[in-house]
């Protein structure tokens, strides 16, 4: 997988959020499940989730999971 592939995957999830397929407060799958579903390494899934967090699209709650943020920062 190329170094920027995680950015494309993050863009894909961001589009799902923008289009309303993932709604505020909705829980994303655990990173390992996300990796399995997308056919990627767990480390790549970790990078995708970190990028979504950096963009303000998701929030992580230790022991509870990762959720779509109530407000997104478009263009971040």
Regions flagged by a language model, labelled:
Residues 1-76:
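N-terminal basic, amphipathic alpha-helical segments
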